[in-house]
Amino acid sequence: MRKKVLITGFDPFDKETVNPSWEAAKRLNGFETEEAIITAEQIPTVFRSALDTLRQAIQKHQPDIVICVGQAGGRMQITPERVAINLADARIPDNEGHQPIDEEISPDGPAAYWTRLPVKRMTAKMKEHGIPAAVSYTAGTFVCNYLFYGLMDHISRTSPHIRGGFIHIPYIPQQTIDKTAPSLSLDTIVRALRIAAVTAAQYDEDVKSPGGTLH
Amino acid sequence: MRKKVLITGFDPFDKETVNPSWEAAKRLNGFETEEAIITAEQIPTVFRSALDTLRQAIQKHQPDIVICVGQAGGRMQITPERVAINLADARIPDNEGHQPIDEEISPDGPAAYWTRLPVKRMTAKMKEHGIPAAVSYTAGTFVCNYLFYGLMDHISRTSPHIRGGFIHIPYIPQQTIDKTAPSLSLDTIVRALRIAAVTAAQYDEDVKSPGGTLH
Amino acid sequence: MRKKVLITGFDPFDKETVNPSWEAAKRLNGFETEEAIITAEQIPTVFRSALDTLRQAIQKHQPDIVICVGQAGGRMQITPERVAINLADARIPDNEGHQPIDEEISPDGPAAYWTRLPVKRMTAKMKEHGIPAAVSYTAGTFVCNYLFYGLMDHISRTSPHIRGGFIHIPYIPQQTIDKTAPSLSLDTIVRALRIAAVTAAQYDEDVKSPGGTLH
Amino acid sequence: MRKKVLITGFDPFDKETVNPSWEAAKRLNGFETEEAIITAEQIPTVFRSALDTLRQAIQKHQPDIVICVGQAGGRMQITPERVAINLADARIPDNEGHQPIDEEISPDGPAAYWTRLPVKRMTAKMKEHGIPAAVSYTAGTFVCNYLFYGLMDHISRTSPHIRGGFIHIPYIPQQTIDKTAPSLSLDTIVRALRIAAVTAAQYDEDVKSPGGTLH
């Protein structure tokens, strides 16, 4: 049976005028295959509001799968995240000026949640299609990790049938005009997220293949 | 009262002939100040044995503080780790040929442990002394994270008065002769670990200052 | 009057199965605007033959402008080259096994030639179109620099009305599946070279704006 | 017969409070072996004055060998430069506010000068001593390249018996506290320059071994 996939992207932050996560997510809104139908929603780069908005979107769309997407400026690959940690520690203020320091996201939640998405399969599938990808083991401690942890905490408490996860993506080329940083084109990112969504719809379980990072 | 600090380093792995973590740790063996006295032990880069060796060293030395140190080839800063995750996922075999894939380190342990060391203070102190340092939020999924998680699991179950943590360090220059990678001199690393040990001995609690990473 | 632009790309080298310079160049073959008409030719990654092939292509097409293009794996921007040096010093053998060491390309040629293309204008124009670009001051010492120097030496001796230059481009994404390296999509590279060709056709002279590198 | 080696370093620029080239050079002042005796002089990071100061130092010390040294922030190796180009193109103003754009350094000089130092030998010797090193083929277009070109132009016209060259060095650790950049310790840099000076004193000619860069 076809799975409903909710994909979210953030609004721009950290002096950027565009956020490739939302640019890519919105292009996938309404995309359908036999396995998956995608809906996209935008999330504010703001602690607390980010999670409120996500919960409302889940309430509204009743998805089988939730994939939150965020910009990881400086990375050169599409990086599905494996683990979310119970820590908000903001190096810069969010879009409303909040800057939590060493705060727990959920006071009675576990130290970390594992993604429920088949991140090794998704990564392998992207690479088969010529897209640079790697599993990541840290989503940072800013709003991206906050949303990822909050998503996993929410669905584990209220709707354990939903599978959730997070994907970090590089800058798009136009963002790197005045900095020296790697980028991937929006087309490549959109293709990567489409592959991720369909793979997540097709497979509940991940493949057991060597992976990991040395540090 | 003066604190006993156990510092561990690994033997060489991944085709290296030297491991800067052990080179640095052994130079600190016997170092004393008013606040701290350091003992060093070597740990094999082998899943399971690493932790057995560490437990024996803790049994033998009865330290107040344990700081495990490991090589993070490619990093350019001294990076105290904040979180250990319950996952062994080896990209390459360890020094005895074991290559666990997606295994839990402790089947009934939590998803993650936080360090008990004041990593922001340690980082700030290193920077005051002109040493590049940053808190890291991922220790990878190889033997370093395995030892870090295993240490925290062990002391939380058997000896919660011990405070433990992990520091990743860059290559030393001689390791980068035939690769293009950053390095720090052994002298700098030794100084950094000494500062870390003394700071950990002086302060139980960390300082609450902005930090974190965007991703 | 419309300018004839010859764009060349290389065949794959250094264990790659594709060379983005030729993939991009061949897509531009036959492209026309009011200012420029583009012809593409492939060049072997072989000392000597590379230059023979280029001279024949110039003879055949009688271009106004020649833009040679080569892969610079590891760069993250489109980088028009400013200077070619009279040195062949091969770190690896070329595609026919030649590995010249510290050889002059032209025994009675100057130590270096400046490009005749308006590289600052080209770079600025690419950036206006959202493409990461920067002027480069070294084309290396392998076949790319060899062809660039040989081109400039040839036209300065035989056909000074022709304006010539070289552009280095990054890997395309599919080349970075099994390495950690930045890339730009083929579409982005094709657009960049089209902008470069048209800009070179429109402007004989470069703009005088701040640029350069600190080292 | 023992060679007199003049080593120069620059004063700080680009918002830095220290320049590792001068910190290292001044530590070598007076250093003697059977082959070499080193004198150090400081050079201002200012177009024109840099060269005036260098010429006076040459006049005063009557060296056999001149090695100018400069900071290349972001590099991770000691990089003897092979070629100086006849171009001043400043991305930022120098320490007196001059910012030449696309200017020739010497209107009737050649497009480039080759170093007269045995840069491959020097690099190999540093690596034998465990120091990361590589020959570089671009000294940039700022005051470093200006001084290097000016040095070679001066001695080729007035004192061709003097052999000259340039070495770029990384940041030292203290400069990278608030940026993410590689560094080498001052001790390592001092050792590297000492090896460079002695090697240059011992060998007039370079070794013919594979080297070079692909781009």
From Swiss-Prot, chains A, B, C, D:
The keyword Kinase does not apply. It comes from the Bacteria. The active site is at residues 81, 144, 168. It catalyses: Release of an N-terminal pyroglutamyl group from a polypeptide, the second amino acid generally not being Pro. Keywords: Cytoplasm, Hydrolase, Protease, Thiol protease. It is found in: Cytoplasm. It holds the Pfam family Peptidase_C15. One of its GO terms (biological process) is proteolysis. GO terms for molecular function: pyroglutamyl-peptidase activity. Its EC number is 3.4.19.3. PROSITE patterns: PYRASE_CYS, PYRASE_GLU. One of its GO terms (cellular component) is cytosol. InterPro entries: Peptidase_C15, Peptidase_C15-like, Peptidase_C15-like_sf, PGP-I_bact-type, PGPEP1_Cys_AS, PGPEP1_Glu_AS. NCBIfam families: PRK13197.1, pyro_pdase. Removes 5-oxoproline from various penultimate amino acid residues except L-proline. Belongs to the peptidase C15 family. Homotetramer. This is Pyrrolidone-carboxylate peptidase. The gene is pcp.
